[in-house]
Amino acid sequence: LHHSKHHATYVKGANDAVAKLEEARAKEDHSAILLNEKNLAFNLAGHVNHTIWWKNLSPNGGDKPTGELAAAIDEAFGSFDKFRAQFHAAATTVQGSGWAALGWDTLGNKLLIFQVYDHQTNFPLGIIPLLLLDMWEHAFYLQYKNVKVDFAKAFWNVVNWDD
């Protein structure tokens, strides 16, 4: 359901926005251009975030990262447990719809955790997303009802650190 309906809707929305954007540009309709750029940003971000998230998940996941990522987490957060606690807090305190994100700051050359509102708001430029957790209700409600804390805890059992 999540992949076939929600994710597919973002792909369709992005494709529709591209077509409408081309039409608006041909007509030099600047109001429509701005509206469709906004719609494209939202839907394309929804598609990209879900694409990353699916790769972040594995039925054989869990445990902890190794190698460079483990070292970078220890350097940025002090330990894996501190990283996990901060990421969990970011996920469980998203107000409304959004994501928890671990990203690589290409300017500061370090890992950062932040909340993403909707799909793209509060997502800093220059960040490469590495680990995402979908905190929209559609991601957890069928299985976890309104207990998003349990969903965020269970996430650690399926994180694909090999990705």
Swiss-Prot record:
Positions of Mn(2+) binding: H2, H50, D134, H138
Catalytic activity from the UniProt record: 2 superoxide + 2 H(+) = H2O2 + O2
UniProt keyword Secreted present: no
Molecular function GO labels: metal ion binding; superoxide dismutase activity
Keywords, sorted A to Z: Manganese, Metal-binding, Oxidoreductase
Cofactors (names): Mn(2+)
Stored Pfam families: Sod_Fe_C, Sod_Fe_N
E.C. code: 1.15.1.1
Cofactor note text: Binds 1 Mn(2+) ion per subunit.
Domain of life the protein comes from: Bacteria
Family: Belongs to the iron/manganese superoxide dismutase family.
Role noted for this protein: Destroys superoxide anion radicals which are normally produced within the cells and which are toxic to biological systems.
Listed name of the protein: Superoxide dismutase [Mn]
Species assigned in the record: Mycobacterium kansasii
